[in-house]
Structures are given as C-alpha cells and as structure tokens.
Amino acid sequence: MPEGDTVLQTAKRLHTALADQVLTRSDLRVPRFATADLTGRTVLGTLSRGKHLLTRIEGGLTLHSHLRMDGSWRVYATAERWRGGPAHQIRAILSTADHTAVGYRLPVLELLRTVDEGKAVGHLGPDLLGPDWDPDTALHNLLAAPARPLGEALLDQRNLAGIGNIYKAELCFLARATPWLPVGDLPATTAVRLVATAKQLLEANRDRPVRTTTGSRARGYLPTERLWVYGRTHRPCLRCGAPIRAAEQDTRPTYWCPRCQSGPTP
C-alpha cells in the first residue's frame, strides 16, 4: 500500500531513470490528455510531495500522479518485458533511450503547468519526508478539530502529508489510543510524541524495501512481526498477547489492541 515512504522511493526510481533524459515516447492513456505528446522534451526530474508524484518536464510542464491504493510506477530497461499488469491497466508510458516508466492503475494522472503545481499539492500540510517539514505546524493542524477521531485526523493530508492507512493504525497503537479517540483527548505530551514518532517511522523506512514499525525485518505477504497491529486481526498483540481487533473507520479497515489502546471503539 503506497504511503509517504514508498511514494518517495518511487520518485527516486523515476528520477534516476528519467532525469536529464529526452523522451522518445510518451503515452498518457486518460481521455483528457490522450492527445498530449511529450516526445522530444527533456525530463527535469521527479519528486514526491506527501503521497503525490510530480515529474517535471522541459517547457514548464509537470506530470502529476497519485497512486492511492493500487497504482504503481514500474521502470524497465529498454528491452525488458513489462510485468506490472495487463495492458488495459496502463495509464502512462514515458520512454527514453535506456528506460521506460510505465504507470499502472493510476487513479490520478494530469498534465499541468509547473507554476500551477499548487493546484495539485498546495492543500497539503507539512510533508513528513519533505524539506518543508514543520512539526509545530503539523501538531497545530492535527489538533485543530479536537472532536475529530484520531485516525481520521492522521489520514487528513491537510494536517500532515505522508500518512496512509498502515501508519495510521501503527501510530495509534504507539500512542496507546484507539483510532476513534477524539484527537483533543490526547495528552499534550502524547500528541507531541505522536508527531515525532510519525516522522521517525517514515524516515526509518524511506529506503527500506520492506516497511517495519517494530524493527523486525521479516519478509512475507502474510502478517508478521514487521507491524504492531495492521493486518494482524485475531493474532496476539506483540506487547500484551490480546487478540488484535479490526473494524472499518471511514470505509477503511483499521486495527487496534483492545488492551493496549484506550478510547472509544465501534
């Protein structure tokens, strides 16, 4: 599941493959930009902003994409077989002499002027992995609506950018609060520590191929000890042994330990 750390990794891969290279092929398979032709333009670079990707292109253009739940960018050598999914799932193709970047299942793909990037990402709060990171502003934003459930406040990218559903559940566990606890009910020291922990976790995972919040490097698709609660329904809590519970919050699954975490539950 793409979150701020994995989106940053995607940006790095795209930047390494495309930056300072001339596009030999461009194909944007979305109706609004289907006729756009970027062939012959030089890619200036790719960067991430929260969970958004911005690929800047010669001529004052930016290709903005967002992966949401299922999207991905894959980079292939020129003669390499594409293995990211069936052809009908491809939304973008950017080729240079040496590499091809293929965007699969991209729910957001738009071409805009670079000077207008703010229309796509200007609403975001401080980026946990960006140069604009400001913990004080992030904390202020997070607590601005005291009655709002903590889980919802953490997912709101206007508060702080980069947290997705996995980090939401993990941060609530580490704060010993259920995702439904009103954010204003967090003790002041806990709220400060929560923001610092969010930064610490994303920084720790920014270059890791497998995300972990517990320190474990175990691999595998099935839930392991890499995460405290996410995806571990009915498994014993790694701290107290109580079975982890799961429920939906704002249409997304969330996870918590009924013994370690205090606050309202469904």
List each language-model region with its residue ranges.
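A cross-family signal for N-terminal binding/gating loops and helix N-caps
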Residues: 1-104, 108-112, 239, 252-256, ...
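Alpha-helical structural motif
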Residues: 3-6, 10, 19, 117-120, ...
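Acidic-enriched, low-complexity/disordered segments with a strong bias for Aspartate over Glutamate
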Residues: 5, 20, 27, 37, ...
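Basic, nucleic-acid-binding surfaces and adjacent catalytic neighborhoods in DNA/RNA-processing proteins
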Residues: 22-38, 44-47, 81-83, 141-266
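Phosphate/anion-contacting hairpin/loop surfaces
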Residues: 63-174
